[in-house]
């Protein structure tokens, strides 16, 4: 445990907490302060100026990261007949209907995303209490309730991520791996910010993007200049 603490302290010492870095600089620092023992995930935490208790300020959506996530995403598809065949051909990891529902009711949640055809949603509703809290419940707003299951599978496998603000007005998302080039991480970060700006609730007053932090798995947080909202991969000084 002391080795972990020492490694963390050494990593944290590289980050100036009083500075706000450009997205490119932050990505470079997040990589530099990541574990050398494995390919760490790079995540972004964003504090939004919204009140999630108000339905019209519950920010949620999806975005296709231009450089993917670097993660092998396990996808479940609730479908039958030709739709099930299409899902399998598109590369879905698990495809089925009632048998998958029963498996989930038994405690199985070994997957990262779930897609369903509209006719399956009555059945999927039986496991809403399991899938919902984990962010796995199919939803038309995120494109995961659809008749075009092949497209949905391909998008998720290709780097499409879902995001949702929590009760404390924070939003967390994966933007890549430490093995990514920092410009690719900055581009992925920019795609997320652009989408958040696009769907900003009209009822949200004051500053919308209030605070941004990048970090690797178990690494220190790197403050990002939240006012930078274009040219995310530019190599400019903060």
Swiss-Prot record:
One of its GO terms (biological process) is translation. Signal peptide: none annotated. Part of the 50S ribosomal subunit. Gene3D superfamilies: 3.30.190.20, 3.40.50.790. InterPro entries: Ribosom_uL1_bac-type, Ribosomal_uL1, Ribosomal_uL1-like, Ribosomal_uL1/biogenesis, Ribosomal_uL1_3-a/b-sand, Ribosomal_uL1_CS. PROSITE patterns: RIBOSOMAL_L1 (PS01199). NCBIfam families: rplA_bact. This is Large ribosomal subunit protein uL1. The gene is rplA. SUPFAM superfamilies: Ribosomal protein L1. Belongs to the universal ribosomal protein uL1 family. Pfam families: Ribosomal_L1 (PF00687). One of its GO terms (molecular function) is tRNA binding. Residues 217-238 are annotated as: Disordered. Binds directly to 23S rRNA. The L1 stalk is quite mobile in the ribosome, and is involved in E site tRNA release. Protein L1 is also a translational repressor protein, it controls the translation of the L11 operon by binding to its mRNA. Keywords: Repressor, Ribonucleoprotein, Ribosomal protein, RNA-binding, rRNA-binding, Translation regulation, tRNA-binding. GO terms for cellular component: large ribosomal subunit.
